[in-house]
């Protein structure tokens, strides 16, 4: 049997005729019902608390703008944040390539999700002890770095569960449901945080009248985010069953830590030999997806430190950004089916680069609202079309492997945007210059995507 037959690919990335087609529902998704799909989506709803509250709009801004405001030395707090997240991304790059493989081979996918989720929640809860004092800046930075690494790694088994709660006929709808749950979960937790703890003026904020002294209101928001994530992460751990051990690749199941890298290298060489289009897309999407993540990671920090948006209004921008990104993703789905995912991604990335250049040239809160929201409109379409692109490339029965590599490559370069953001802030001694770092990542991803051939669109006879 040829290498193409063993891997399930022909040289065009299509189905190999001498390998039997795998029924995904029969192998992993047969028992999946509406309750399991909802439980799976609720994890995304809950995890949005880390992305929206901790990493993007509340705690990271508090850490750089308040806690680190009097930090001695010539390095900006936002540069330290970029480097800390860059280190976390590098750690993920070392461990993510083998984590999904080992989780599945040991039949501990759900257990791994539970452990990594719990570690993420623990770091979030400990952020309550980061007081408004520059001495606590390093403690907060360490918590944010570890939390980011745990959260990124938790996404590996979570994304792998998609095949357990879907079939090839509905994987797009189920995946889109999870994506929407994440966006709208972020909106809800931001609204609760803003109106309950942050809005208003004076020494006590929000409807709950929480004091702002020593950052109490923000520290309570971090604790709320931890409880939110914990509550909505539990259903998937009870509703979706653990996978039985697989015998599909005995070598992968028995491989140790370093042996797992040899297995990964073997699989990548085989894929490169028979389907370079898929490899090209995996590389390109990994790069531009890290740029998309950088938009949300550093957007709030730039809003406050560069464009003069009040701390209390950052959450309003975050809510608006999540709404327009969700609407953009829904709208782009229609164009994806009509013109193909590549055009959607290319147009979205070009539009984002143009909006980013405009942000480099303008100042003030109004201009940030205008061009910031214009930019985020195209984040959702690029994300959803990237998933659709790979779904069209993956041959029947190999979707799990493809999305495992999709996750792996994305995590492997997750240090690029934070590191370049930090580098440009440091090099030009200006927070605004960090925008250039994000734009560079988006532009490199776009350039890498352009030569990748559009996948064939196949209408399922379902």
Where would I find each of the regions flagged by the language model?
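Helix-to-loop junctions at the C-terminal end of transmembrane segments
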Residues: 94-108, 327-341, 425
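Short amphipathic helix-loop junctions that connect adjacent transmembrane helices
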Residues: 54-78, 297-313
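Multi-pass alpha-helical transporter architecture, strongest
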Residues: 228-239, 436-462
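Intracellular juxtamembrane helix-capping segments at the cytosolic ends
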Residues: 153-166, 381-394
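Juxtamembrane intracellular "pre-TM" segments in multi-pass secondary transporters
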Residues: 19-38, 241-283
């Amino acid at each position: 049997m040829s290498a193409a037959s063993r891997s399930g690919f022909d040289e065009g990335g299509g189905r190999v005729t001498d390998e039997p087609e795998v029924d995904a529902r029969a192998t992993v998704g047969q028992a999946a019902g509406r309750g399991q799909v909802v439980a799976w989506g609720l994890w995304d709803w809950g995890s949005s608390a880390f992305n929206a509250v901790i990493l993007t709009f509340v705690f990271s801004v508090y850490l750089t703008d308040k806690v680190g405001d009097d930090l001695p030395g010539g390095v900006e707090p936002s540069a330290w944040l970029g480097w800390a997240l860059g280190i976390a991304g590098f750690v993920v790059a070392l461990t993510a390539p083998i984590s999904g493989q080992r989780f599945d081979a040991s039949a501990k996918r759900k257990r791994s999700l539970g452990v990594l989720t719990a570690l993420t929640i623990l770091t979030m809860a400990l952020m309550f002890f980061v007081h408004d004092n520059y001495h606590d800046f390093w403690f907060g930075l360490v918590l944010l770095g570890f939390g980011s690494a745990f959260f990124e790694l938790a996404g590996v088994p979570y994304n792998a569960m998609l095949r357990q709660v879907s079939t090839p006929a509905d994987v797009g709808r189920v995946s889109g449901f999870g994506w929407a749950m994440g966006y709208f979960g972020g909106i809800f937790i931001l609204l609760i945080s803003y109106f309950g703890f942050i809005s208003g003026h004076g020494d006590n904020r929000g409807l709950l009248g929480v004091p702002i002294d020593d950052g109490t209101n923000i520290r309570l928001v971090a604790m709320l985010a931890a409880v939110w994530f914990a509550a909505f992460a539990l259903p998937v751990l009870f509703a979706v069953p653990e996978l039985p051990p697989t015998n599909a690749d005995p070598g992968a199941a028995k491989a140790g830590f370093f042996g797992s890298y040899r297995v990964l290298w073997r699989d990548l060489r085989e894929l490169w030999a028979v389907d370079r289009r898929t490899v090209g897309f995996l590389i390109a999407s990994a790069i531009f997806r890290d740029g998309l993540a950088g938009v949300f990671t550093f957007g709030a920090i730039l809003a406050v430190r560069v464009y003069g948006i009040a701390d209390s209004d950052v959450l309003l921008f975050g809510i608006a950004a999540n709404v327009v990104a969700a609407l953009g993703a829904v709208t782009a789905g229609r164009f994806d089916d009509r013109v193909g995912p590549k055009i959607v991604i290319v147009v979205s990335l070009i539009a984002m680069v143009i909006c980013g250049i405009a942000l480099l040239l303008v100042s003030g809160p109004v201009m940030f609202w205008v061009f910031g929201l214009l930019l985020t409109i195209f984040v959702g379409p690029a994300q959803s079309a990237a998933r659709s692109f790979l779904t069209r490339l993956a041959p029947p029965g190999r979707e799990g492997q493809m999305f495992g590599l999709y996750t792996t490559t994305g995590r492997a370069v997750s240090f690029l945007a934070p590191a370049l953001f930090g580098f440009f802030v440091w090099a030009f001694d200006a927070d605004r210059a960090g925008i250039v770092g994000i734009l560079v990542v988006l532009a490199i991803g776009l350039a890498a995507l352009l030569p990748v051939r559009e996948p064939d669109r196949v209408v399922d006879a379902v």
